[in-house]
Amino acid sequence: MKKFNNTIIIGIDHGYGNMKTANCCFPTGLIAYNCEPLFTKELLVYNGKYYLIGEEHKEYISDKSLDEDFYVLTLAAIAKELSTESITEANIYIAAGLPLTWTSGQKADFSAYLMRNKEVSFTFHKQEYHLHIEGVSIYPQGYAAIAPYASKLTGVNVIADIGNGTMNVLYMVNGKPKSGKMFTEKFGTYQCTLAVREAFMQQTQRELNDHIIEEVLRTGKADIPKSDLAIVRSEERRVGK
């Protein structure tokens, strides 16, 4: 979050696994209700609906503007970032990203999607927020990470941005991106989770929760039987080859 004159600039990474800002990170998922749910710790209320933020896992969609979910998750991300400085009303400029090869084709629609309401009010964590969205800029994912020092790169460099839903690869030659050598593949870490889940089900006729699989992928262990852990670790190694 940066302040420029009377505007707050907030960078948001709309990941398939996690929503991220400079100071916050939370799972990309939500559940919508028509009335207030029993548990309200991560409750966002917007446009007459109740959303539990961070619940479930949003399934992969190639166009993030196709439904309401990423808009609501954006509101939550802004609120979480503003809450670090106890701000509840502000002029906001959103800086967001899209996968490399999708940026040109989708940036106009995604920008309009995030700008759909220039004035927006909602409640998050029982706190009211009032925002004026002044503008949106869309940038290519991955490249943004090295942009500040790209001119210092020499020779051939390969930038790999491996996310939950996609993997972006960009070739750089003497600090300049090669437009003809950039790729976006639907092969992120969640595909590994799905492969492990399917293999486990085939071998045991039981379903293993994604959270347990992800814990094993991150730490190499989980509170499950040793035989189950062995299946997960074996499939993890197979997929990772």
Region spans (language model):
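A short helix-loop
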Residues: 171
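Ser/Thr-glycine-rich phosphate-binding loops at phosphate-binding pockets of nucleotides
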Residues: 162-168, 237
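Long, charge-rich alpha-helical interaction segments
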Residues: 194, 198-201
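Nucleotide/phosphate-binding catalytic cleft detector across ATP-hydrolyzing
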Residues: 1-159, 174-191, 203, 210-241
